[in-house]
Amino acid sequence: MNVEGRTLSISNLGKVLYPDTGFTKGEVIDYYARVAETMVPHLSGRPLTLRRFPNGVAEKSFFEKRCPSHRPDWVETASVETSEGPIDFCLCQDRATLVWVAQLAALELHPSLSIAKRIDHPTVVAFDLDPGPPADVVDCCRVALRLRELFANFGLECFAKTSGSKGLQVYVPLNGKARYEQTKPFAHAVAKLLEKQSPDEVVSKMKKELRKGKVFVDWSQNDRAKTTVSVYSLRAREQPTASTPLLWAEVEAAGESGTAEDLRFEAGAVLERISEHGDLFAPVLELEQDLPDL
C-alpha cells in the first residue's frame, strides 16, 4: 500500500476486530487513513502510547510505549526519560505513520499532554469525567457545563469531547509556559471545588467505592507520566466508537433532555461530523491561556 509516497505492508484486512458489528481491520485502517488530516495535528510531536488489540476488542490487549523495533525507517521517534529509564516513543507525524499504527491493530492511541521537545510543559489541562453507575454520560454533561461556567469566570475557554467510552473529557488549552507542577494541583483544586459545590453528584477522590451514582472528576491525568486517549481515536468498545469533539450546544441539549443517545459516534459518523463542522478541537492546538490562581 502506498500512502503519500511511503510504502506499507498491509495484511489481514478482512480480520474482524469488533465482533459485535463485524468491523474489520481494513475498516479500521480506512478510518484512520481518512481521519488523518484532522487527527495528525493532535498527535504530531507527542510521545505516543499504543493500545494494541491483535485479536480484536473481545480478546486481550496490551499497551506499548516503546516504538516497535520493526518500524519503517521513516517512522519518527522521541526519547523520553521515564521511571523505567529512557524510552523511544513513536511520533505520529503523518498519514503514513497513522496507517502503519492501524496496521498494528493499535485501535486506541494515547498521546502525552505535552510535546516531546517540551515534555515538562503540558499544552492543556485535561479533566476526565467518569460516571459511576447509575450515573451516566448525561450526568457527565451537567458536570462539564459546570466546569465551563467555572472556567468562564476565570476568563478561560474549554472544549469538550466524548471519551468514546462511558464519559466526557474537558480540555483547557494553555500552549504556554505552565508545567505539570502547576497544572496537576490546579486540576485537583478544581475537582475538589466541584465536589464541595455538588457533593451528591461529584467526587474528586480516587477511591472507586466512592463513585457510585456520581461523576468522578479525574484530575490525575495531568501528569508527565500519564497519557489520555486522543481526540478521534477509536475505542475498544462493542462498536467502533471514537473520542469525538462536541459542540457545547450538544452538551447543553443532553443535560437538559436527560438523554445522550446523540453523543455516541462510530467511525463513519465522526468522518461525517468533520465534513460538516471541521475540527471542533482545532482551538485546543493554538489557543494560549494562562492558569489563574485558585
Language-model features: locations:
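Flexible loop/turn segments at secondary-structure boundaries
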Residues: 17, 57-60, 70, 135, ...
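Nucleic-acid 5′ end/cap handling module spanning
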Residues: 138, 161, 174-177
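Short beta-strand
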Residues: 51-53, 117, 158-164, 205-209
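Short, conserved phosphate-binding/catalytic loop or strand-edge motifs used
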Residues: 162-172
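Long, well-ordered alpha-helical scaffolding segments within enzyme catalytic domains
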Residues: 31, 137-156, 183-198
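SsDNA-processing nucleotidyl-transfer enzymes
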Residues: 1-4, 34-126, 130-133, 137, ...
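Catalytic palm subdomain of template-directed nucleic-acid polymerases
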Residues: 171-183
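C-terminal accessory nucleic-acid interaction domains of nucleic acid-metabolism proteins
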Residues: 1-22, 29, 40, 44-45, ...
